Each structure stands twice: as C-alpha cells, then as structure tokens.
Amino acid sequence: MDVQPTTMRGAVKTAHLGTDVSLATKPLPKPEWLRGKSASTPDVERLVRILRDNRLHTVCEEASCPNLGECFRKGTATFMIMGDVCTRHCPFCNVAHGSPHELAADEPVNLARAVELLKLSYVVITSVTRDDLPDGGAGHYGACVRALRDLKRSLKVEILTPDFRGAVAVAFEELRMNLPDVFNHNLETVPRLYPRVRPQADYHGSLDLLLRFREQFDHVPTKSGLMLGLGETEQEVRDVMEELRRHRCDMLTLGQYMRPSPHHLPVERYVTPDEFERYRQFGLSIGFSHVESGPMVRSSYHADMQARELMLVN
C-alpha cells in the first residue's frame, strides 16, 4: 500500500534515523538578510493554477524554498517530476518519504504544456529519488527532455538529478539520446557530515557521478551545490570545492541551510554574506565558470544567469 506524503513528513520521517533533531534545540534567531518576500501575488496564483491544471509539482513548494516568492513572481519554477514522495529520508529535506506511486505516463507532455503556457526559456527539472526504479528514473528524465525539445523553439534545459545509486551506467544510456544543456547533481554537504545529513548517500559516489557524466558527454557542463550552516568548517568547504574542480565540475551554488521544521536538522550557524562572497571569489580563482554564492541561493536559483557564463543562453 502506498504511503501518503502527509504521513511521512517531519518527526515520522526522521524518527528512525538515529539522528538528533531534538525539539529541545533552541533555534538560532534568523538574521535580517534571510527575510524572504511574500509569495502571494496574482502572477504567483496564475503559475500555481497552471501547475495544478497539469498535475505538476515544483521543488519550490515541496522543499519550502525561501526564494519561492521571488521566482514565482518572475514566472520561473523548478519542476519536480516522478511524484512528490521520495524513497529516501534525509533529515534536512522537507520532501515527503514513503512508497512512491507509479510514474505518470503523461507527465512529460503536461510539463511541456506548462512550459509553453508560462513562456519559459530556461527550464530546470529535478525529482525525488526513485530507488524503486531500475534506472533510477533516468528514462523519465529523458522523456521530459524530449518533450521539451519537441516544442521546437529556443529552450535550454537543466536537470538536477539524484545519484542513480547502483544504476549509473543504465541511467546514462537512458539519457544519451536526450541530453540536457546542464547536468546538475548536488553534493549538499562536506564528507564528514554525510552520516548525519545524507545517511543514505555516498559522497564519493556523487563525485564519481559528476565526473563520469562529464567524461561521457564532454560538451555538457556539470554543476553541483552545497548547503552551509550544518557544522562544516571553512577549510572543509574549500576542500570540497577543489575536489569538485578535480572532478571537472563547471558551476557551483552555495547557500544557507534553513530548517524546514523543528523535526529537521537544526541550523548550526548562519553564514554571513561576506563569507559567501569569499567562497565565490575562491571558487572563481580555482576555475569554476560561475559560482552563485549567497544566503538565499539554492541550486536552481538564477540558473539561467548561471548558465550564461558558458554562453548557453542568448
């Protein structure tokens, strides 16, 4: 029996991980630079209506992204395919965990219709992790990219994928005929914190995924992202940035982790805008084509502007 998303959020989702997300943890006061704008405007309501009419989800809503208001007002969104229930239960993430439903065969067509209605020129597609599928859902990613290409207009597509654990070779074969313009896979945090932050993932496996994609599809740039404020040190962040460059990663996003609820990992520290700027400058100095670094940055925030650094967008 499928588990409904609402039954596997918050405390129920993270209780069995053995990770301390105690309600007794007093939250740090949020600094002024992290105050987002309200998402409620007529333009936002129109976008939400189009998404609902086409039975689509956005990671903006599911992950409680702090930029939801800004991006929705600009008519952009990161589409989350393959449902809104994830087979993993990372204690930093607000997406529901459970047994996912079957893939919706009409989702690629619905996605293309929504993109056309919204008149988007740069589309980001991400997904829940689907360990239940033999190819990790790569074939569905490919079908969505193909549907967007069929629109026959100038449109750039970025995919932000899971790690395709145990199925990387199969996944790449599925993507081969429908490659994106940018391949994005987030490391999320430094290796020392993986047992606490990403207990079902493998740091070196994620690095290897980025390198293998770049080696097989050399003309497609790669991208990754980190959340800061979970207890990492500055040297650890710099080490990861250097390791990403050694694995031929082209673009990087760095943003502040923000706790979705009291049942998720607490924020250990709010990183200042000046620190984010230092990371940006360091990233550029070691060869990243673009580093989007700031408290409110998320992996698909200003994705079109990030890609311009590689002349992907007119």
UniProtKB/Swiss-Prot annotation:
Q: Where in the cell is it found?
A: Cytoplasm
The source organism is Pelobacter propionicus (strain DSM 2379 / NBRC 103807 / OttBd1)
Q: Which GO terms describe its molecular function?
A: 4 iron, 4 sulfur cluster binding; lipoate synthase activity; metal ion binding
Q: Which NCBIfam families is this protein grouped with?
A: lipA, PRK05481.1, PRK12928.1
Cofactor(s) this protein requires: [4Fe-4S] cluster
Q: Where does [4Fe-4S] cluster 1 bind?
A: C60, C65, C71, S300
Identify the pathway: Protein modification; protein lipoylation via endogenous pathway; protein N(6)-(lipoyl)lysine from octanoyl-[acyl-carrier-protein]: step 2/2
Question: Cofactor note, please?
Answer: Binds 2 [4Fe-4S] clusters per subunit. One cluster is coordinated with 3 cysteines and an exchangeable S-adenosyl-L-methionine.
- Gene3D superfamilies recorded: Aldolase class I (3.20.20.70)
Please give the superkingdom of this protein's source. Answer: Bacteria
Q: Which UniProt keywords apply?
A: 4Fe-4S, Cytoplasm, Iron, Iron-sulfur, Metal-binding, S-adenosyl-L-methionine, Transferase
Q: Which family does it belong to?
A: Belongs to the radical SAM superfamily. Lipoyl synthase family.
The residues that the entry says bind [4Fe-4S] cluster 2 are C86, C90, C93
Q: Which gene encodes it?
A: lipA
Record field: catalytic activity = [[Fe-S] cluster scaffold protein carrying a second [4Fe-4S](2+) cluster] + N(6)-octanoyl-L-lysyl-[protein] + 2 oxidized [2Fe-2S]-[ferredoxin] + 2 S-adenosyl-L-methionine + 4 H(+) = [[Fe-S] cluster scaffold protein] + N(6)-[(R)-dihydrolipoyl]-L-lysyl-[protein] + 4 Fe(3+) + 2 hydrogen sulfide + 2 5'-deoxyadenosine + 2 L-methionine + 2 reduced [2Fe-2S]-[ferredoxin]
Its GO CC terms are: cytoplasm
| Annotated ranges, domain Radical SAM core | 72-289
Q: What is its EC number?
A: 2.8.1.8
The kind of enzyme this is, by top-level EC class, is: transferase
Which coarse location class describes where this protein primarily resides? cytoplasm
Q: Please indicate if the UniProt record lists rRNA-binding as a keyword.
A: no
Return the protein name. Lipoyl synthase
